[in-house]
Each structure stands twice: as C-alpha cells, then as structure tokens.
Amino acid sequence: MVEFAFDIKHLFPQSIIRVQAHSLRPKVTQCRRYAQTERGKSTMTSCRLSEILNIMGKLSADAQGLCHAVTSADKLASDQVVYLMADKAAGHWEITGLLKVGTKDLFVFDQGGCYRRLNQTPAILDFYVHESRQRCGQGKLLFEWMLEKQGWSAHKCTVDRPSNKMLAFMAKHYGLVRTIPQGNNFVLYEGFFDDPITTCKSASGLQATGSGCRSRSQGHYVRQEQDQAQIKHGQANRNTVQNDANSGPFRQDQKIVVGTSIYRRRWKSPRTLARAGCREVSGGRRF
C-alpha cells in the first residue's frame, strides 16, 4: 500500500474514485478558499490528486520495467479517466490501485485480415495494483468497477502494451486468451468484431468487407475489389479497341491506323514507336 504525508480520507467518499483532467486544473478562485496546512502547503484537492497520480504512475512504471511513467497528472488527456482504489485495512486510508482508461482511434486488422479504422475504441492504458494487494481480488474489483462506469465489456477493450501479468489477468478472470495479431502495440482479443456494433469503416472510408485485406502468403495488402474493377475496366477497353479495329476498313494488322482513329492523334515520337513495336511509313521512308 502507498502512504502519503497528507490525509486522503476526504478524497475517497468511497473505496474507488474517478479522476479526470478537469479535476486536476484548479482555478484561481479555488486557491483562495483553501487554508494552509501547518507546513505552509496548499490543501487543494486537485494538488493532492495530482501528487497521487504522479506517485502511482511511477510505481506502475517500475513494476512493468518502463523507463517513463504512462500515468501522470500532466499527461492525463480530456478523454482519459483514472480510477483510484484505496482502503483502510491498516487503520487509515491508503492507495492500493490505479487503472487508466480512454478511447483511441486505431487502424487494426480483424480476424479475416481486413484493415479497419476504429474510432473511439475502448482502451486499457495503465493498470497497477500494489504488491500487497495482489491476488486478493482487488484488481478484479477495480476492473469490474471501471467496466460498469464506462459501460464497456472486457472482450471489447483493447490493451496498450500489456505486461505478462495483464495478459494473465485477462485470461484468468475473463477467459480472454487468443488475440488478433496487430501491427501496433495494442492487443485485441478474439470476439472483438463479433458484435455488429463494431462493424467499422476501412481506411479508404468504405465498408471493410473485402477491400483492404491482407495477403497472408505475400505479407502485404491486396486491394481485391479495386484490382477486380481495374481488370474489368481493362478488358472492356481492349474489347472496344478490337471491335473498332475489326469494324473499320482496316484490320488489326494495321495497328497505326487503329491507334490514330481511336486517340485522334498520330504517334510521332520515335521512342513511342519503338516502345509500341510499330513502324510508321511516311513519304515512302521508314523510320
């Protein structure tokens, strides 16, 4: 458990509280309302919450072996929420856990390999429970509280850079084991796309049914619908050329006449003639 130099009892009307960015930005008028402690420091709630977030974020980063903290008061965005857990098992209130969530706009692959764009996707950004409270049901209680308040379900959440403990937590409590391989640091579990609500648009703005699919054998993206459309368009153009050539007074063996009648211009560049494999006869001379 994490102890602080100040009393946190008044910060926790219940065991789990919800902290957002606007609650960490005090106004000047608020600063005048609070008295000074015996140490001469402000007793503002926002300042204390900021200190709690910074310390808990540092502990979470150390537990995961990260060089920089994921959670801090300065980094908390307007679309992110931090859930703090505390208890008074030792006779006074102490912080025991932190859970940071938010929404992300992601480009992901579904189970069929199709490339999709997901807007406002639920994301687990940071999760930490103090070592003295692990394997006691505290993490599950904090996670369930978050799901209820956010209106999310576990299999619809993406996880940013999950640790081995986080993966084991999701497998133990929610049976989420099999993941969908992605090209970024987020983990998606199978079943994420089963609900029709998650039918999203592809990167091109079209419904991601066949376009933007990934070729597993070649390792790159194949625009199937676009390729098929181009093939059909090319076949139609060739059929038009053949019909025009066969219906005129000259046959296909006189290619230069066909090309001139279709495009209404003559090929005068020698480089173009060489590329097309044609020879133009002008004034009885060959070029």
UniProtKB/Swiss-Prot annotation:
The record marks 64 as: Crucial for catalytic activity. It is found in: Midbody, Midbody ring. Keywords: Acyltransferase, Transferase. Residues 2-193 form the N-acetyltransferase domain. Acetyl-CoA binds at residues 127-140, 163-172. It catalyses: L-lysyl-[alpha-tubulin] + acetyl-CoA = N(6)-acetyl-L-lysyl-[alpha-tubulin] + CoA + H(+). GO terms for cellular component: Flemming body; fusome; microtubule. Specifically acetylates 'Lys-40' in alpha-tubulin on the lumenal side of microtubules. Promotes microtubule destabilization and accelerates microtubule dynamics; this activity may be independent of acetylation activity. Acetylates alpha-tubulin with a slow enzymatic rate, due to a catalytic site that is not optimized for acetyl transfer. Enters the microtubule through each end and diffuses quickly throughout the lumen of microtubules. Belongs to the acetyltransferase ATAT1 family. PANTHER family: ALPHA-TUBULIN N-ACETYLTRANSFERASE 1 (PTHR12327:SF0). HAMAP family: mec17. This is Alpha-tubulin N-acetyltransferase 2. The gene is lky.
